Regions:
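Active-site acidic-Proline motif in GNAT/NAT acetyltransferases
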Residues: 77-83, 111-112
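Conserved active-site alpha-helix within GNAT-family acetyltransferase domains
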Residues: 87-88, 99, 111-130, 136
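Conserved GNAT acetyl-CoA-binding A-motif
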Residues: 97-109
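Glycine-rich acyl-CoA binding loop
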Residues: 50, 82-87
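Charged, low-complexity surface patches
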Residues: 8, 86, 109
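Acetyl-CoA-dependent GNAT
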Residues: 2, 6-73, 77, 90-92, ...
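Short, charged/polar, Gly/Pro-enriched secondary-structure boundary elements
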Residues: 141-144
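Short aromatic/hydrophobic contact patches that present stacked aromatics
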Residues: 75, 106-108, 135
């Protein structure tokens, strides 16, 4: 049995621990407590955690830019997978976005993360081949 609730900054340490224990998830300076606090404040009630018997078993962060939604860091620990947790987390995010009038959502998957790519394809998400994403880091710090 699991319980999904809104993520708060009090969950930060446990969420970072989940991410560190999950292959394919990259943590950057942008995942700092301060940056996470700003993200949660800018996108209230849109990121979620999953409570399981032993603590947190999963999480997802969700936000938008006013036009498009974005999912980041969907994580479910291996022992809790195949129970519908990831699907329920994503549905909460998409419903939250829809309440804000946002019907299209994007996410990024590292090309080396085949497990995640397989999951998203199995859920009906489409791999975009018509665009390339470019990034620029003003500070020059590639960990930002």
């Amino acid at each position: 049995m699991f319980n999904i609730r809104v993520m708060t900054l009090d969950d930060y340490d446990a969420v970072i621990d989940l991410m560190k224990r999950t292959p394919g998830v990259s943590l950057r300076d942008a995942d700092s407590r301060e940056s996470t606090a700003k993200y949660l404040a800018r996108n209230p009630g849109m990121s979620f955690v999953v409570e399981v018997e032993a603590g947190l078993g999963g999480c997802v962060m969700c936000g938008h830019d006013g036009r498009r939604g974005y999912l980041q860091h969907l994580v479910v620990l291996p022992q809790f997978r195949r129970q519908g947790i990831a699907k329920a987390l994503v549905e909460r995010c998409l419903s939250s976005l829809e309440r804000h009038g946002i019907l299209k959502c994007h996410l990024d998957v590292f090309k080396t993360n085949a497990l995640a790519a397989d999951y998203w394809r199995s859920q009906g998400w489409q791999l975009r081949t018509d665009i390339d994403r470019y990034s620029f880091t003003r500070s020059g710090d590639e960990n930002a």
